[in-house]
Swiss-Prot record:
Residues 1-27, 276-290 are cytoplasmic. The gene is ergic1. It is a multi-pass membrane protein. The chain crosses the membrane at residues 28-48, 255-275. Possible role in transport between endoplasmic reticulum and Golgi. One of its GO terms (cellular component) is Golgi membrane. This is Endoplasmic reticulum-Golgi intermediate compartment protein 1. It is found in: Endoplasmic reticulum membrane; Endoplasmic reticulum-Golgi intermediate compartment membrane; Golgi apparatus membrane.
Length: 290
């Protein structure tokens, strides 16, 4: 007696002439196919799309930077001449630089009565400050007007990624034109290291920051202190990491199989219930007629 492998077939075939098509079954089949197509396209879209997961940890992500952070500053002072505007930098490592001019540019505004300062410079990864003032001017003005608009203040590499909302330029658009002309402005910054990791594993380093500010007119025993625009910064020990991820292929296949199998099973149960109820109703009607 030869062994017949067909005995293991769990998908036994029923001759077509023994099946009975119904309008209800056709309707359920069409709805079933449309439903499966909709779910398949939804899962395919989710599989192709990249999701961004964020996490927090304590570490310095950019150890190769040499302990430096690049800063980009763009600020307009519409009532202060460019000859008077300067940038000073100092920190807890002993750095004290007055009138920083490297990689900076001054653009006259309002027919020379105002100035837009654009500069790129580096700061050490220690608490410190940089400030826009008239300290580097040859002759100090009597009443410098420090009203201003901050167009940009950003730290680290430029990071513009869709679906990532962050405070990379938190002071961009800050308008202090209606402030007291003789007031100093203190911006207290907490810089947060940020890492963005792409699907291929490439990492980009940047910095977000939170800000609090105050405005005041300062005095000493000798009289009023020359106003300035201060940016006092400190670094957060917490790093924010954004990681691009895509759903694994095996999960996509598992979900598709579940959609197809589950839909066919539920549709078969519904069709069977409707058909059984219909046949029972027909028998009841025949019994009443007889």
């Amino acid at each position: 007696m030869s062994f017949d492998v067909r005995r293991f077939d769990i998908y036994r075939k029923v001759p077509k002439d023994l099946t009975q098509p119904t309008y209800t079954g056709a309707f359920i089949s069409i709805c079933c196919c449309v439903f499966m197509l909709f779910l398949f396209l939804s899962e395919l879209t989710g599989f192709i799309a990249t999701e961004i997961v964020n996490e927090l940890y304590v570490d310095d992500p950019d150890k190769d930077s040499g302990g430096k952070i690049d800063v980009s500053l763009n600020i307009s002072l519409p009532n202060l001449h460019c000859d008077l505007v300067g940038l000073d930098i100092q920190d807890e490592m002993g750095r004290h630089e007055v009138g920083h001019i490297e990689n900076s540019m001054k653009v006259p505004l309002n027919n020379g009565h105002g100035c837009r300062f654009e500069g790129e410079f580096s700061i050490n990864k220690v608490p410190g400050n940089f400030h826009v003032s008239t300290h580097s001017a040859t002759a100090q003005p009597q009443s410098p007007d420090m009203t201003h608009i901050i167009h940009k203040l950003a730290f680290g590499a430029k990071l513009q990624v869709q679906h990532v909302q962050g405070a990379f330029n938190a002071l961009g658009g800050a308008d202090r034109l209606q402030s007291n002309a003789l007031a100093s402005h203190d911006y207290i910054l907490k810089i947060v290291p940020t890492v963005y990791e792409e699907l291929g594993g490439k990492q980009r380093f940047s910095y977000q920051y939170t800000v609090a500010n105050k405005e005041y007119v300062a005095y000493s025993h000798t009289g009023r202190i020359i106003p300035a625009i201060w940016f006092r910064y400190d670094l957060s020990p917490i790093t924010v990491k954004y990681t691009e991820r895509r759903r694994p292929f095996y999960r996509f296949i598992t979900t598709i199989c579940a959609i197809i199998g589950g839909t066919f099973t539920v549709a078969g149960i519904i069709d069977s219930c409707i058909f059984t109820a219909s046949e029972a109703w027909k028998k009841i009607q025949i019994g009443k007629m007889s």
